[in-house]
Amino acid sequence: MSVLWRISNHSDLSGEGGRRGSARWHTRGRPIVYLADSPASAMLEIVHLQDGNGKLPSFYHLLEIRAPEDLPIKDLLTMADAGWKQKLELTQRIGNAWLASLATPLARVPSAIVPRTWNYLLNPEHPDAGHVKIESVVRERFDDRLFRFGPR
């Protein structure tokens, strides 16, 4: 089993958040679940999700997610593809095409935040998406030091 991670206040893999808003690898209206290969990567990927005051909520849920080793994963983009971080429309087009194709339940994409790190996308509409399951959910408090910048 492969282990993937997600930080969310919703303990499901429905992809409903993707229906409500666009992100790096999809446009609004499409169910999708963003996953990371470690809890630390999942934490760093949510930096941009601060509230309007630049703050994160006090608590979060860390989801440990299991996928069978033999579940197909498609690489959507290599880290060598130059300039992709600045081409949001390109990455959204690639992600939307993958979602529509139902080619694989999981896709691997490079992190735009952490160099040489991979993230994963789950297409909840793929027939084999049900094999990807939440193993555990732990409620944790954000460490105040984590996102504090500037003088101490």
Language-model features, listed with the residues they occupy:
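Active-site and NAD+-binding cores of ADP-ribose-processing enzymes
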Residues: 1-18, 26-27, 55-152
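Extended catalytic/binding region for NAD+/ADP-ribose chemistry, centered on the ART fold
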Residues: 27-49, 120-125
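Short helix-loop boundary/capping segments at the starts of domains
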Residues: 48-56
